[in-house]
Amino acid sequence: MKQKIYDYTIVALIFGCALIIGCQPKTTQQSHEPTPDSSWALLPFVKVDSINPILNPGDNEFECPILKRTVKWEEKDVFNPAAVVKDGKVYLLYRAEDKVGKYAGTSRIGIAVSEDGLHFTKMQEPVLYPDNDSLKIFEWEGGIEDPRLVATEDKQYIMTYTSYDGTTARLLFALSPDLMHWTKYGTVLNGKYKNTWSKSGAIVARETNGSIVATKINGKYWMYFGDTDLFMASSDDLIHWNPVEEDGKLKSVLRPRAGQFDSRLVESGPFALLTDNGILLIYNSMNLDEGGDPSIAKGAYCAGQALFDANDPPKLVHRLEKNFMMPDKPYETTGQVNQVCFVEGLVHFNDKWFLYYGTADSKIAVAVKE
């Protein structure tokens, strides 16, 4: 029950202050300072407008083992990168599309490296791509998309990625000792969920001496995934994953919210970061055309943050009410898919946080938290 306030002088003062504040000019910001209810969040991120976008499509070629001919594998678009710090450098593993085939673009994973986290040099060929292997049935000819990346305790790297066969997207994963050579392990979900539409696997990890390392909670590794609601899976070894269920179905741990920036869908961003406050998950979202947030564009992809219980990973503790990043630059509002900021790569480098994101499914940009 709310306590009644009888001191009309105080009421008048409060009302007057509110009027003064309400009459101040409104500004639109990409990020906001933490408030008492969002002090757990990783904020603020500022877009580096002076150099964005930092990665663009190019003319690099490689010999496609399936087509058996040379293709310009990144000439259409580059977007949605994972990021990792290795040997004092930042590596981006990014999605790239050619202009070939019935989907007018097969996706592959390329790699670029930077000394400062801002200026990148691409490698000539992709490092992960559809091949004549046992996973071709899942990966061809839509391709391999949207990587997420963390290190493992035994000095390897695990990448989750999406395969697309033209009908169903599936969440797959691969391991590498050096970021250049990858061994595919197949689908994350198996059994009755093997052919379920699944995407965007964000493994829970901690920061250790500048590296982001997959970490166990209650004796298990954990992963958030999904692109409608968010769901979870756990693993003893990072290889064999078991979905978290409720009443025999995938348990939803984060849902869209009517009338808000994340009204249509929610989708994992980078890895989920274990902090002193809990498990911090930066996530992507889409605004409904009708019934969403009227202050942002219809169908816009914006970024939010949520906090989960460090001892009970499916338990949601806090969630930002407003997005902290939205499309407002020309290269974010216009492209292959308009109105998109899609966050996917995060590193702690040179005492700053670098957040890498796809813009309009066409290019790559960066925002920095000091």
Segments (PLM) and residue ranges:
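Bacterial N-terminal signal peptides that target proteins for export
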Residues: 2-10
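Sec-dependent N-terminal signal peptides
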Residues: 11-14, 18
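Beta-rich carbohydrate-recognition and catalytic domains
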Residues: 24-80, 84-142, 150-264, 273-336, ...
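Donor nucleotide-activated moiety binding/catalytic core segment of transferases
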Residues: 262-268, 339-342
